[in-house]
Amino acid sequence: MPCRIAIDGPAGSGKTTVAKILADKLGIYYLDTGAMYRIIGLYLDKKGVENDSDIERELSTIKLEFINGDFYINGKRVGDEIRTPYAGICASKYAKKAIVREFLTRIQQKISKNENIVVEGRDIGTVVIPDAEVKIFLVASAEERAKRRYKELLDKGVKVSYEEVLNEIILRDKQDTEREIAPLRQPDDAVLIDSTKYTIEEVINKILEVVLEKCKLKLQKE
């Protein structure tokens, strides 16, 4: 029986960092679904498509692959261009589209099927893997999330202001919680963790307690 760990939460709540470390400690796969929406959002934005028929046409030309932890779109490896605030806005814009969500959900379900895997995003425990063995809902204040994202971008050499990042966080929250299709919400059976008051290590340990209790997995790294 596989152990599929679903980690959901708003933008900048630490999902990506936590999911990566957790997967590494457990020696299992890690899938960042938010990155997939950023990839498709930027691609469709560059194509300038808005209506469903045009989006459907463009999606039919896309081959999105997940190979050894990296994403490739039509054979080209995806880099840090998807981590900018603008890419986040594009992601939320197109994530409202049912056709886009269905396209990516199918790919995500195919990747995670019958695998020991950590999958993080905004609708993993509610839509992508509603029967996941472990569900975590990770939250933090908007200000704390903006500080984290701002530092992350600066460390990568991306020029951006704190105010710009905070505004993006606030906008993303509004878009993600109010969209009609698969809005961001806490699954009924998810464990809620507010990372505002915890270190990354403390969050990881809390999740590991849940995982090791529910799944037949062993720590590969301390």
Swiss-Prot record:
Chain residues that bind ATP: G9, P10, A11, G12, S13, G14, K15, T16, T17
Any Gene Ontology CC annotation: cytoplasm
GO biological process per UniProt: pyrimidine nucleotide metabolic process
Subcellular location as annotated: Cytoplasm
GO MF assignments: ATP binding; CMP kinase activity; dCMP kinase activity
Family, similarity comment: Belongs to the cytidylate kinase family. Type 1 subfamily.
Catalytic activity: CMP + ATP = CDP + ADP; dCMP + ATP = dCDP + ADP
Pfam families: Cytidylate_kin (PF02224)
Keywords attached to this entry: ATP-binding, Cytoplasm, Kinase, Nucleotide-binding, Transferase
InterPro entries attached to this UniProt entry: Cytidylate_kin, Cytidylate_kinase_dom, P-loop_NTPase
EC assignment: 2.7.4.25
EC top class, as a word: transferase
Entry superkingdom: Bacteria
Protein name: Cytidylate kinase
